[in-house]
Curated annotation (Swiss-Prot):
PROSITE patterns: EF_HAND_1, EF_HAND_2. InterPro entries: CALM/Myosin/TropC-like, EF-hand-dom_pair, EF_Hand_1_Ca_BS, EF_hand_dom. Belongs to the calmodulin family. This is Putative calmodulin-like protein 6. It comes from Oryza sativa subsp. japonica (Rice). The lineage of its organism: Eukaryota, Viridiplantae, Streptophyta, Embryophyta, Tracheophyta. Potential calcium sensor. The keyword Lipoprotein does not apply. The keyword Metal-binding applies. GO terms for cellular component: cytoplasm. Disulfide bonds: none annotated.
Amino acid sequence: MESHLNEQQISDFRDAFSLFDKNNDGCISREELATVLTRLGMAPSQEDLQDMIVAVDEDGNGTIEFDEFLAIMKKKLYENDKGDDEEELRKAFRIFDKDDNGFISRNELSMVMASLGEEMTEDEIDDMMKAADSNNDGQVDYEEFKRVMMSTWNITEIFKPHVTIWRYKP
């Protein structure tokens, strides 16, 4: 089993961490965790959120720092084989890639999020694009999309066992 993450993996996990760390203070609070999970379509209770924090919070300070986040992501990365998810990812990418040019534009992202009932501000759309567009070309290719989605799946898999009931928003 691989025991070290490469620089790209660490960078990807730092990007994922920053999506949660809304105030950029270097830690994920219960409120920040709730915000992101709600955007992912989940509605965990306050008790569920506390259980999630406790499961990852090694130093017991009530928040998740990057080193704690990285340790659990590394563990999950090597526990899970995501090979079966490749076709699902390609299908999801095609849903976003409305003009079928191999890229997701900001406009396509905005349209799909709106069609899913996600009311997002222009700044939130910009933040999503910035987080996904690692080569800064103004669009998201399949590999960038896959990186973000795999990080999201790993994150939800980490927290799922600690939630008593996942309530998905209609």
